[in-house]
């Protein structure tokens, strides 16, 4: 997640020195599909007002433009990368402004334009990629279970969760949710390799790749597919094999607006952490109920409560309230 600096930076960024950077350098190159570490050069530095500066002192926040960068800029629902400039700064977030890939940093040492630096993407990237690939499988599973009328209406992919909005006229039943969840997990177990291709937009559409409605695409697009299960136009980062996703668990299904539903889910380490939290809650419940079978214990308690209520009701009606024996 990025800092308050970016969340409140809309007006500032509108007046930023991006045009000057574009004219001087053009768009910088993203190499993060293949590389998570790189040696790069600082082309430009921007302060909190998005204005060009020659340097950032230690302890300051600002934006950095590298000549080449492994940091993915937030796009297509996928959060921006974090990481570090080795020995120099923590990378808090990465965003795209007018085609420029810029990283928000908090410096540990001074940074200057022209510095040669080493960049490392943080470990969250791998988890984000797993959740992004799981989102593609979820989309495919929804179309398989509910029908091909399903169309993506929005998404958000982070390292510990995913959210997928889609067109559908009514809430999913428990059975439908289970079918979707099971199908995604079955596909994960097949261990299909991911395949990425860059092709002409029309060629991609003819190949059966799913494109987002009303989305503007370049003439050449990136197509991500997993076996014969999923094929979508996507610029995000993904696993190399779907078994890297681990397990997949739907945590919530809800409505967003008329005709739009939302599924929230977790996979990989986040799914394991969720399972552990469920287990901890179950053990706590067993301790509280003094029973190894909490469901039966709850049913027994409900029966006892009903019996006591009946006793109380009868006592009130007979005028014997003061002499109730509840044992």
Tell what function each PLM region has.
Residues 1-327:
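A glycine- and charged-residue-rich anion-binding loop/surface
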């Amino acid at each position: 997640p990025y800092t308050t600096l970016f969340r409140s930076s809309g007006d500032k960024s509108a007046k930023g020195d991006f045009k000057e950077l574009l004219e001087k350098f053009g768009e910088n190159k993203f190499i993060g599909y293949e590389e998570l570490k790189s040696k790069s050069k600082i082309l430009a530095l921007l302060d909190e007002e998005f204005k060009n500066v020659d340097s950032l002192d230690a302890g300051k926040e600002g934006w950095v433009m590298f000549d080449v960068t492994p940091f993915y800029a937030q796009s297509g629902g996928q959060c921006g990368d974090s990481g570090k400039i080795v020995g120099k700064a923590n990378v808090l977030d990465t965003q795209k402004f007018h085609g420029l890939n810029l990283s928000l940093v908090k410096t540990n040492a001074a940074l200057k334009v022209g510095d040669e630096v080493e960049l490392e993407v943080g470990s969250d990237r791998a988890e984000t990629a797993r959740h992004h690939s799981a989102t593609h499988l979820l989309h495919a599973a929804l179309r398989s279970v509910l029908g091909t009328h399903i169309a993506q209406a929005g998404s958000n992919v982070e390292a510990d969760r995913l959210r997928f909005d889609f067109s559908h006229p009514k809430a999913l039943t428990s059975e439908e949710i289970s079918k979707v969840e099971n199908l995604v997990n079955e596909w994960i177990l097949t261990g299909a390799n991911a395949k990425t291709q860059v092709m002409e937009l029309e060629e991609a559409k003819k190949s059966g790749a799913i494109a987002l409605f009303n989305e503007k695409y370049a003439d050449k697009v990136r197509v991500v597919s997993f076996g014969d299960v999923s094929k979508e136009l996507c610029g995000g980062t993904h696993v190399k094999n779907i078994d890297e996703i681990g397990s997949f668990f739907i945590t919530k299904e809800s409505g967003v607006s008329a005709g739009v539903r939302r599924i929230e889910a977790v996979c990989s380490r986040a799914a394991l952490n969720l399972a552990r939290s469920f287990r901890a809650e179950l053990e706590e419940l067993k301790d509280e109920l003094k029973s190894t079978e909490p469901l039966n214990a709850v049913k027994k308690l409900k029966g006892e409560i009903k019996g006591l209520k009946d006793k109380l009701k009868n006592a009130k009606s007979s005028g014997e309230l003061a002499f109730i024996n509840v044992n």
